[in-house]
Amino acid sequence: MTKVIKSKYKVSRRLGTSVWGHEKDAINNKNYKPGQQGNSSSISKPSDYSKHLIAKQRLKSHYGRISEKQFRNTFKIARKKSGNTAENLVGLLERRLDAVVYRLNIAPTIFAARQLVSHKHIKVNGKKINIASYRVKAGDSIELSEQAKQIPIVIGAISKKARRIPEYLAFDDEKFIGNFIRMPSSISEVPYPFDPQINLVVEFYSA
């Protein structure tokens, strides 16, 4: 197991949930923080601040450990938009190109999805985009480069029988082209492997 994978598993253990929903995630067997010797009844309950902080860290980690500056700026945009701030925030995060590639199951992890984008393996409406935070919009097509179609992890991800693609996206397995059909209609439509507690995140930045 590589140091990177170990680090990811430690994140899940530290945050108390499987942030990316991996079956091999250590949290499934060790439901306590790194360095802690098993579950202990003497551990104090988290404060309200800790609950809000953990909710924020879980969401940031789920989207590939977005920087605090970038995440905070995304929240500011969500708050300025009309409508529900929590839904706006999720909508903006789901529009990130690396997140779309991940949701389309073109890559097995959000980190692999980001690599595909940064290495110019992804096209949006026929144009190569290498910015992970690039925001796609309804109607945009997402296409793999010819080289990417031969990458083993891409082939493996696409060929999985248990692939689950959200209703707001679509993917043509033969043409290797995906579509961002629309924005998520609700937070519950987004396939988070944990309770995202978006309202706690909103409250954290609104305090």
From Swiss-Prot:
It comes from the Bacteria. GO terms for molecular function: rRNA binding; structural constituent of ribosome. SUPFAM superfamilies: Alpha-L RNA-binding motif. The keyword rRNA-binding applies. GO terms for biological process: ribosomal small subunit biogenesis; translation. GO terms for cellular component: small ribosomal subunit. Gene3D superfamilies: Ribosomal Protein S4 Delta 41, Chain A, domain 1, RNA-binding S4 domain. Keywords: Ribonucleoprotein, Ribosomal protein, RNA-binding, rRNA-binding. Signal peptide: none annotated. Residues 95-158 form the S4 RNA-binding domain. InterPro entries: Ribosomal_uS4, Ribosomal_uS4_bac-type, Ribosomal_uS4_CS, Ribosomal_uS4_N, S4_RNA-bd, S4_RNA-bd_sf. Residues 28-39 have a biased composition (Polar residues). Residues 26-47 are annotated as: Disordered. Belongs to the universal ribosomal protein uS4 family. Part of the 30S ribosomal subunit. Contacts protein S5. The interaction surface between S4 and S5 is involved in control of translational fidelity. One of the primary rRNA binding proteins, it binds directly to 16S rRNA where it nucleates assembly of the body of the 30S subunit. PANTHER family: 30S 40S RIBOSOMAL PROTEIN, SMALL RIBOSOMAL SUBUNIT PROTEIN US4M. This is Small ribosomal subunit protein uS4. It comes from Orientia tsutsugamushi (strain Boryong) (Rickettsia tsutsugamushi). The gene is rpsD.
